[in-house]
């Protein structure tokens, strides 16, 4: 399992730890990933994803998983999240056609 956020694509960065004497040693900056279960209102089911804490805040800010995926660019989403985005768009289109 890679250390990459399913929603934002945030991954591992590398850099230096700098001591008081300015001695630099290599280190890795790991993203704050959480295994979460988010609910899709359009699909009426839950979805398990591995997302960063920052992405979780963004999902809340945008008004839920469906709104986040609708607005997100395809390049930053994982293949699994992209599948859910397509399923949600398809279900929303079907719901709109049956309502009309």
From Swiss-Prot:
Domain of life according to the entry: Bacteria
UniProt key word Ribosomal protein: yes
Keywords, comma-separated and alphabetical: Ribonucleoprotein, Ribosomal protein
Recorded GO CC terms: cytosolic large ribosomal subunit
InterPro entries (alphabetical): Ribosomal_bL28 (IPR026569), Ribosomal_bL28/bL31-like_sf (IPR034704), Ribosomal_bL28_bact-type (IPR001383), Ribosomal_bL28_sf (IPR037147)
UniProt similarity note: Belongs to the bacterial ribosomal protein bL28 family.
Disordered: region residues: 1-24
Record GO terms (molecular function): structural constituent of ribosome
Gene3D superfamilies: Ribosomal protein L28/L24
This protein's name: Large ribosomal subunit protein bL28
Species: Xanthobacter autotrophicus (strain ATCC BAA-1158 / Py2)
Any one GO BP annotation for this protein: translation
Xref: Pfam families: Ribosomal_L28
